[in-house]
Amino acid sequence: YLRGFEIAVREGHARSIMTSYNPLNGYWTASNYDLVTTILRGQWGYTGLVMSDWWAEGNDRGGAGSTKHVAAMVRAQNDVFMVVADPEHNSGGDDLATALAEGRLTRGELQRSAANICRFLLQTPAFRRGIGRTSALDDQLEAMAEQDMQQAAQSGQPLTLRDGTAIDITAI
């Protein structure tokens, strides 16, 4: 069953993956260490972001599934739990703080997921533009836009936006 997913991840150069709602071999996929860490990250070499489906359940050691079992998801390297209405006040009542205090989750496991999230963000075009690094496509599109602006200014015609607003760019 996994071959199609492996092809999509490797050949499609996936940068983010959402785990499904369902259990597989007794473990909900959002918290399935073998699936997310051993296979996806280990065997396939995936380094991107993994997020749960909205209000996905997780379980620990084959127990009952619950949206509160977020520590098991973090341990499996499911980096982002979707969705929490008020994370500052733990409105979902997840078990992260308790699991950390009891030693069922380590600071290193939390840091590993934080590193996965940061690695993902550092590779986004928005981040690259924010630090002044653009791709060849960004540079090409910017040059084309500049050329279009110059041609419009030389023609003496106003630039018309999608909403119909006309802008006189001859003085630009």
Predicted regions and their residues:
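Short, well-ordered coil/turn segments that N-cap beta-strands
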Residues: 13-15, 44-48, 78
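Short acidic, glycine-rich surface-loop motifs adjacent to enzyme active sites
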Residues: 4-28
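Conserved, mostly hydrophobic/aromatic
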Residues: 1, 17, 53, 77, ...
